Amino acid sequence: MKNLYVGLMSGTSRDSLDGCLVSFENGLNVLSCKTLNFSEGYQTSEDQAFISKEITDKSIELVNKLVETERQNVVAIAFPGQTISHNDNFSLQAGSPEIIAKQTKIPVYSDFRNFDIAKGGKGAPLIPAFHKYLLSEKETEKLVLNLSLIHISEPTRQSLI
């Protein structure tokens, strides 16, 4: 039995939702990636209720597309939600992990930002951990470029060892 995972992500620009189906057997294996665009009218903070519904619905649609032949092997979905507001002391995310879990019948892990803030972090715990994992392979040179509007980390070679 394979252990597969779905990772979802939407940027602060609120233009689309990206998803990947991956496994970590013998390193990172990206099995499939897909993108769904958001509606044009739901890109402002005033539309929070609509944003929450749309990110939930689009997440369900995207997960179902990613896992159509592998659903029985998917262990979990990582769903950070759509950032509505974020600073060092709090983060507000739109989207319903409970509905995504119920509709896809796959466990959903979410609210990473507030968990990180509660532990004294800046609310962006996943990317630095993923970069550390990705960059730990010493055989090849790698470069990571973060183009997000929320600064996550500036890893040094020493901090990754």
Label each residue range with its predicted role.
Residues 1-3:
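Short, Lys/Arg-enriched, disordered terminal segments
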Residues 5-49:
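Short glycine-rich, Thr/Ser-proximal phosphate-binding strand/loop in the N-terminal lobe
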Residues 5-9, 74-78, 142-146:
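Short glycine-aspartate micro-motif
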Residues 151-161:
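Single conserved hydrophobic/aromatic residue that forms the stacking wall/gate
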